[in-house]
Amino acid sequence: MFLRTESLKQYVRLYPVTTVLICIHLVVLGLMEWTGSSQDSRTLLRFGALFDLPGMVPEWWRYITAMFVHIGFAHLFFNSFTLYVFAPPLERMLGAWRYALLYLLCGIAGNLASAWFHSDYFISAGASGAIYGVYAAYLFLAIFRKDLIDQQTKQTVITILVIGFLQSIIVPHIDLYAHFGGFIGGLAVMGLMSLFIKRRHLRQRAELERQLQQAEQELQERQGEPE
């Protein structure tokens, strides 16, 4: 499910929301580097990072914008690559607008948790909260909709979550609260969406994703055969 074999043109056509999200990440970081530095506090705040500073209350819109801001190239690459690999199947299953809504709500949930639980000075940015919401959506489907998520995918998601949360606890300067908030948000939003999305609709989209992946793999194998 998470093996990406599409060409760039196919990827953009099949997964428009994920493509737009990654492009926004790249554009924002490029502008930050052009006008300052993506690791400079003032530049981060100017471009919408979340913060908690003495005597200041963050504007409401930062809970949205912070998920598109990244602190350095490594931060950008890791989050964007994770989106590139793991988000497409969920976008196909939910459809573009539902997936976009889930992503945004999970990112906001992560930023709200970050602001709520941090008690001292901090600046927070990145798509990690939203990404953990995507993981949570897969986990929800793996538990409650086993017809959509195979066992291997379930094990992959659980392994990533365990490693991710351990890393969030052990490695300094990683926003555990944002990850946890996004994860809880993902479970909640996916749970609500599952009540309103017809089971047949999800099943058809999941089967379509499997068929597309299989067709792409077969095409690549044929292209690799000698004439």
Regions found by a protein language model. Give the residues of each.
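C-terminal transmembrane module of polytopic alpha-helical membrane proteins
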Residues: 1-17, 23-24, 165-227
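C-terminal ends of transmembrane helices
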Residues: 4-5, 83-91, 139-146
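N-terminal TM1-TM2 helical hairpin plus the immediately adjacent luminal interfacial "cap"
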Residues: 13-125, 172-174
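Cytoplasmic-side transmembrane-helix entry/capping segments in multi-pass membrane proteins
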Residues: 96-104, 126-131, 151-158
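Alpha-helical transmembrane bundle and helix-membrane interface signal
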Residues: 92, 140-155, 195-203
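Alpha-helical transmembrane segments that form the membrane-embedded catalytic/substrate-binding core
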Residues: 76-83, 125-137, 174-194
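Alpha-helical membrane-inserting segments
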Residues: 27-32, 109, 113, 117, ...
